[in-house]
Amino acid sequence: MIFTGKILRALPEARSYVSEVLRQAGILIISSSAIIWTLMMVLGAEGSLEGHYLLRQLGAADYTAIFTSTGEYSAGPSIFGWILAAKVGCGLVAELGSMRISEEIDALEVMGIGSLAYLVSTRILAIFLVMPFLLVVGFGLMFLTSHILSIYFFHSVSAGGYETVFWTFMTQTDFLAAVACSMLMGVGIVIVGCYYGYTASGGPVGVGRNTAKSMIINMVIVAVIGVISQHLFFGGLTRAPIGQ
């Protein structure tokens, strides 16, 4: 909490480093978008596969889209959080930790550059810029993958039937809630990664130890936020009662 407060106080200073914010945003997109989008497409394919073979036995293959619609706001944010924790969170610990033990952070302070603003706050702002783009495209690819497989590969349902069921069990409000949940996970993951990287000590061994700690804590954060958000946003849905 103390570290988070320091980050918030340093955010106004980060406005002086717009180019660094954009650079970090570009790095996040280039290095993380492919794996995030690929796994969300896999999730969409899995939803269509399970939906087809399970519901076909019950004579309800027309409702295959239920699996994708619920997956968008239930499994989707968790998958996003786990990937972000492994790819981005651990990367931040390694990057900032190596800078700490090689005294690069101390050198920034000596030069009069606020290390928290330049190294941490800029990354927080970058993740705020990048996450909506990654999430919207990821959820779109998840829907598109399931849509194509269900209609043209498994022949479970027609295009109109698929879209009708999908939007019956998922509204724009559900989508925005899923994005908000994912962004909350992302901010928490980046803060944890920056904390363990910024405070690393003990040489390369210490950096490795902090990387492992950050991954464990981020997995807990994703699980806790996921459970709370499911009950808060979707637990009372009469059309798709989850958690009741």
Question: Where are each of the predicted segments found?
Answer:
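Short, membrane-interfacial amphipathic segments enriched in basic
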Residues: 1-19, 196-201
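Hydrophobic, aromatic-rich alpha-helical transmembrane segments
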Residues: 17, 21, 25, 29, ...
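Active-site cofactor/substrate anionic-group-binding motifs, chiefly glycine-
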Residues: 24-79, 83
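Selective transmembrane-helix segments that form parts of the transport pathway or gating/packing helices
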Residues: 29, 33, 37, 84-88, ...
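Generic alpha-helical transmembrane segments of integral inner-membrane proteins
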Residues: 37-41, 45, 128, 132, ...
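Membrane-interfacial helix-loop-helix connectors in multipass membrane proteins
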Residues: 50-73, 137, 141-183, 192-210, ...
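A hydrophobic alpha-helix feature that marks transmembrane segments and, especially
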Residues: 82-100
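Short cytoplasmic-facing helical segments at TM-TM junctions of multi-pass membrane proteins
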Residues: 96-121, 204-207
